[in-house]
Swiss-Prot record:
The gene is CCDC198. This is Factor associated with metabolism and energy. InterPro entries: FAME (IPR029235). Keywords: Cell membrane, Cytoplasmic vesicle, Lipoprotein, Membrane, Myristate. Residues 173-204, 256-281 are annotated as: Disordered. It comes from the Eukaryota. GO terms for cellular component: cytoplasmic vesicle; plasma membrane. It is found in: Cell membrane; Cytoplasmic vesicle.
Length: 296
């Protein structure tokens, strides 16, 4: 970076003529050099000069600027030098100097290692490695023996568990077979009893009794015997059908016991009102499976 530098100079072209010829424009070749140290005189002079220029340029168009790209303009122009009042350095590098290189030193300096010390360190390292290898060799058989014992223990526990499961399955199968064997004779006995009992299609059995049976006179002992016999038969529902068939057969043949009775009893029965025939209904009770075996 150098102090000398080139600046582009601007050319001012006047466009409109002056309206008042008497007013003289300020000389273009006049150059102000502000070398006075007194700041007040400099500012007052610049303000008075600017006022004179404004009065002279009233009614004119603003000037056009043209770049000549490094060529000097023919007309002279005002120049102003920025001269600092204080005496100081103008160089940017001197104003902002770069940082100085700092020397970094380690805190712990390495010790000087001799050849004898290096050999002793190597020997100690090899001895330590050999000791570690020997310890590993001593630990490996102990570790394998522990593993072997653990595996053997797990195998024994697995065998015991399988044996217990097999015993439980065997017990379950034996219990099932015993139940089947107990139920088979019961089923056989039940089938025999069902086959031995007569089968009636209708569950409700109607017992039609003749009118003469209902005449419970004091002298009619035969009727009481028949009623007793009928009450006994009520406990055996499968015998009611046979009794009815026998009564119907006897009626058809006319050989009933009460037909051979005296004529006096017949006349008394005719005089009295004949009661309505009694119809008894009884549902057939089928014995259950458990009750059949409980009776034994």
């Amino acid at each position: 970076m150098g102090l000398s530098h080139s600046k582009t100079h601007l050319r001012v072209i006047k466009v409109a003529p002056l309206q008042n010829k008497e007013v003289e424009t300020p000389s273009a070749g006049r150059v102000d050099f502000a070398f006075n140290q007194n700041l007040e005189e400099k500012t007052s002079y610049s303000l008075a000069r600017l006022q004179d220029q404004n009065k002279a340029l009233e009614g004119q168009l603003p000037p056009l600027q043209e770049n000549w790209y490094g060529r000097y303009s023919t007309a002279s122009r005002d120049m102003y030098f920025d001269i600092p009042l204080e005496h100081r350095e103008t160089s940017i590098i001197k104003r902002h100097p770069p940082q100085r290189l700092q020397k970094l030193e380690p805190i712990d300096l390495p010790r000087v290692i001799t050849s004898g010390r290096l050999l002793s360190q190597r020997e100690a390292r090899t001895m330590h490695k050999a000791k570690q290898v020997l310890e590993k060799k001593m630990q490996t058989p102990m570790y394998t023996s522990e593993n072997r014992q653990y595996l053997h223990k797990m195998q024994v526990l697995e065998m015991i568990r399988k044996r217990q499961e097999a015993q439980m399955e065997l017990k379950k199968s034996l219990h099932g077979e015993a139940r089947i064997n107990k139920q088979s004779p019961r089923d056989h006995k039940a089938k025999k009893t069902l086959q031995s009992t007569p089968r009636n299609d209708d569950h409700d059995l109607l017992t039609m009794l003749p009118d003469e049976i209902l005449n419970r006179g004091p002298g009619n002992s035969k009727n009481t015997e028949f009623l007793k016999h009928q009450a006994v038969n009520n406990y055996c529902p499968w015998k009611i059908g046979k009794m009815e068939t026998w009564l119907h057969e006897q009626e058809a043949q006319g050989q009933l016991l009460w037909d051979s009775s005296s004529s006096d009893s017949d006349e008394q029965g005719k005089d009295e009102k004949k009661p309505r025939a009694l119809v008894r209904t009884r549902t057939e009770r089928i014995p259950l499976f458990d009750e059949f075996f409980d009776q034994e």
